[in-house]
């Protein structure tokens, strides 16, 4: 039987202790031998990112998952710093920047608003696909495969049963992340 793809789960939440939804989503991830959970805020409380170490982690994995809350239509500050430092020209893009070619990118996002808020005629004025476009473009710049994002809308208002259902589906996907279909 073939080995499952190696997954690097980059977790970026500056207030992880207060995020019930993200803690529930992380539970199945830590149970899989093919998944490396890498908590950026725990590792880099001072925001000084060890770029060579991070790039080595990326080389060792096939699927890169970016799990974080949606902050001001983007990601938390440390993840943005990580993207700018680690996905550098010559490593992930530009001349010689071929280290991530063919790997997979999947965003796993929690939001504080319902899905209905992400429409052209609604509160946020744009659908989530537009909000996440910079991440999709970054994946394309790195010549990675963009996978449909997993979004848990209105995360803090979801029932424990709904969050458990999301976590179960997420865990099943993590077990075999590049198979056809899935969560």
UniProtKB/Swiss-Prot annotation:
Record GO cellular component, one term: plasma membrane
Biological processes, Gene Ontology terms: positive regulation of potassium ion transmembrane transport; potassium ion transport
Subcellular location: Cell inner membrane
Keyword Membrane assigned: yes
Entry membrane topology: Peripheral membrane protein
Disulfide bonds: none
Predominant subcellular localization, coarse grouping: membrane
Reaction catalyzed: a quinone + NADH + H(+) = a quinol + NAD(+); a quinone + NADPH + H(+) = a quinol + NADP(+)
Alphabetically ordered keywords of this record: Cell inner membrane, Cell membrane, Membrane, NAD, Oxidoreductase
UniProt superkingdom: Bacteria
EC number: 1.6.5.2
Family annotation (InterPro entries): Flavodoxin_fold (IPR003680), Flavoprotein-like_sf (IPR029039), K_H_efflux_KefG (IPR023947), KefG/KefF (IPR046980)
GO molecular function: electron transfer activity; FMN binding; NADH:ubiquinone reductase (non-electrogenic) activity; NADPH dehydrogenase (quinone) activity
Any Pfam family: Flavodoxin_2
Gene3D superfamilies to which the protein is assigned, alphabetical: 3.40.50.360
NAD recorded as keyword: yes
Quaternary assembly: Interacts with KefB.
Known role: Regulatory subunit of a potassium efflux system that confers protection against electrophiles. Required for full activity of KefB.
Family: Belongs to the NAD(P)H dehydrogenase (quinone) family. KefG subfamily.
Protein name: Glutathione-regulated potassium-efflux system ancillary protein KefG
Organism in which the protein naturally occurs: Salmonella paratyphi B (strain ATCC BAA-1250 / SPB7)
Gene responsible for this protein: kefG
């Amino acid at each position: 039987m073939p080995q499952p793809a190696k997954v690097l789960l980059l977790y970026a939440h500056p207030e992880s202790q207060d995020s019930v939804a993200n803690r529930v989503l992380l539970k199945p991830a830590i149970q899989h031998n093919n998944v490396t959970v890498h908590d950026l805020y725990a590792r880099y409380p001072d925001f000084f990112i060890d770029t060579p170490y991070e790039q080595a982690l990326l080389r060792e994995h096939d699927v890169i998952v970016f799990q974080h809350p949606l902050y001001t239509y983007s990601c938390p500050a440390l993840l943005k710093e990580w993207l700018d430092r680690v996905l550098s020209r010559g490593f992930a893009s530009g001349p010689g920047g071929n280290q991530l070619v063919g790997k997979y990118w999947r965003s796993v996002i929690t939001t504080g608003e319902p899905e209905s808020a992400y429409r052209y005629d609604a509160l946020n004025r744009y659908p989530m696909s537009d909000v996440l476009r910079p991440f999709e473009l970054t994946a394309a710049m790195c010549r990675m495969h963009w996978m449909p994002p997993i979004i848990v809308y209105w995360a803090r208002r979801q029932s424990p049963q709904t969050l458990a259902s999301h976590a179960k589906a997420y865990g099943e996907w993590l077990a075999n992340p590049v198979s056809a279909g899935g969560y």
